[in-house]
């Protein structure tokens, strides 16, 4: 055994020394919370202990800049600004949207695409690449200057020069340049400067706008867009790659083969194709059937006349195009104006064979490659360029994906001898938008990569009525409070909460998973399940949405909106905490003293019903004093929850 240590404080000295050492070490390596002031009245011995600063946070950078400028900060009081609830949605008010639209119209001429510099056979590849880089850098600086000076928001345009080189090659080798746009918002996906650039390269080239996904539009909506582009002198063709693919794979293939064999069909047969040949998507099938009864008869004569004018126009313009060729700029402009006056657009959905025949009739002049008509397909990502090629070819020649920007290189495919299709990679061209939420809802930005889900879902709630959302998903969205507008659109939180509870999307804490629900709803909006079609300029956006009312009417006729007796008759409403507390039964209570009930009230129990009173009066144990419970409880303890 070891030597016994002395009881008591034998190690007290060591403990004190150890604590003092630890205290000195802690003060040496940690900062103190003591307030000090730098007087700068002595010699700075730490002037040589410099630290290199290469990166700073935004706050540190701001404070360092303010210190260098000698700026002093003074607290401002009584500078109160009320932030409305709509500010968190990320959407613009009506006044702000009108102001931004005015700025868009004033600066529309600055929206351009990069040009390829002039070159000839004497230009070396190195000189051409350097000239392309210089022009591209100049173009990017111009757009950045436009954003900074005018405070405008541009779409995230393509910043890779190799993609623009693909576009230049497609335009140079194409006789017809087809811009494919989305039928729900054609003006956003249309690039007017691209049409000018095509004419700058060769005046004999033709510009055409192919409105894809046109099966989402009704006959009246297609007619409105046809008239709008006809006034601007732009040739448009209404087309649906998905609907045509379903048609070719369906039971009506024999009818399509007969149409392909007979190219000289009458106008009545071409108009009947619009109503009977194209199978529409699930959401639009009911609305198209009701719209065809009321609208197709109204536009039959117009469509027949427009088809005759289209064929006459293309045949008459072929002769002067062959004779004139590439003339001076003044003659080109005069010829272009003459063509614009004779443009007539049809509003019916064309089939595959009709689309190819229109391509052959549009360009009859001198071709880039003798004996071959080359059609270049350009446009934004995910608008259906590759799907259009696969539909025309009859099988999968180009890979297709729902993610924007899937096609990386242009490729040429021969449909038949003398007709070649050229698929260009999707390019996001510079365009004006009000918010980033519009780019997400229009499919320009990927939904899975969004950071904030509130602005795009709020935009969906503004465009799609409350009743359509409830019918589409089978949910009940909570109603506004009594002091709010009963017709206001639902907020993003109300929609996502109802959708998440219905689908069972919950977080770890038992709350509805709103970001996950937002991705599903936004994908339905981009895919067309939640349909909103932008109208032409000058049209009322609310009156232009024919599908919403037709969808509700079809659901009512089908019996899907019938409510079960005693269920779903009254939707939930946002509770007002003040009203609920004020009118609660606990607040209405008589304060009495004594054991026996007075006028139906007992101390600590409130109102006593007749059934309860009769049960207590049963002579079982009369010696029990049940009324002494909470007899001496003070009122301020009973009603402490009412104290402020």
From Swiss-Prot:
The keyword Translocase is assigned to this record: no
Top EC class of this enzyme: hydrolase
The reaction(s) this protein catalyses: GTP + H2O = GDP + phosphate + H(+)
Keyword terms, alphabetized: Cytoplasm, Endoplasmic reticulum, GTP-binding, Hydrolase, Nucleotide-binding, Nucleus, Phosphoprotein, Protein transport, Transport
GO biological process terms on file: nuclear export; protein transport
Residues that, per the record, bind GTP: 212-215, 379-386, 423-426
Modified residues (Phosphoserine): 93, 97
Domain CP-type G per the UniProt entry, residue ranges: 164-430
Family to which the UniProt record says this protein belongs: Belongs to the TRAFAC class YlqF/YawG GTPase family. LSG1 subfamily.
Domain commentary: In contrast to other GTP-binding proteins, this family is characterized by a circular permutation of the GTPase motifs described by a G4-G1-G3 pattern.
Protein name in the entry: Large subunit GTPase 1 homolog
Organism the protein comes from: Mus musculus
